[in-house]
From Swiss-Prot:
Assembly description: Component of linear elements (LinEs), which are similar to synaptonemal complexes, at least composed of rec27, rec25, rec10 and mug20. Interacts with rec10.
Biological processes, Gene Ontology terms: meiotic DNA double-strand break formation involved in reciprocal meiotic recombination
Effect of residue 78 to E: Decreases meiotic gene conversion at ade6, crossing-over between ade6 and arg1, and double-strand break (DSB) formation at a DSB hotspot
Coiled coil spans: 56-140
Official protein name in the record: Linear element protein Mug20
Entry keyword set: Chromosome, Coiled coil, Cytoplasm, Meiosis, Nucleus
Length: 151
């Protein structure tokens, strides 16, 4: 009888040891899986944060390009208004000349002087507008390039 009890105790001890071993292995596997998941989540968060920082930098660069374009458009509007004011001045001078009587020589001298001033004004206006349009085109090109490169 004592042999049976000893045999049963041995079997019970072996089964208990196997169960404890299996439990320790299962816990170890679960722990490894949890650690792996934790490290994976941390890496994903780092990648997302880096992507967010990069996107924010790109948006700031685009905001700067937009601000530059707005300033250039504002300068174009100022030039446009300046040209309109000068054209109104020219029209006023034409009206003034037309309403007064001049001797032929005076009128020719006045006309030539007026023509020179008008040609010079036209050149100056064209140069200013050309420069402003070139700046605007450069900003537009930079903006398109930045958008294509960044998004």
């Amino acid at each position: 009888m004592s042999e049976i009890i000893t045999s049963l105790q041995t079997e019970l001890s072996n089964r208990h040891a196997n169960m404890v071993s299996e439990a320790v292995l299962a816990f170890s596997e679960h722990h490894d899986s949890a650690l792996h998941s934790y490290f994976l989540n941390a890496r994903v968060k780092d990648v997302i944060l880096e992507s967010l920082r990069t996107t924010e930098e790109k948006l700031r660069a685009l905001d700067k390009l937009q601000l530059d374009a707005s300033k250039n458009l504002s300068n174009l509007l100022v030039e446009y208004n300046s040209i309109n004011a000068e054209l109104e001045s020219v029209n006023s001078k034409i009206s003034s000349i037309s309403s007064q009587e001049y001797a032929l020589e005076e009128f020719q001298a006045l006309s030539q002087n007026f023509e020179k001033n008008l040609v010079q004004h036209r050149r100056n206006s064209q140069n200013k507008l050309k420069c402003a349009m070139e700046k605007l085109k450069m900003i537009e090109t930079s903006t398109h390039k930045a958008i294509l490169d960044n998004f």
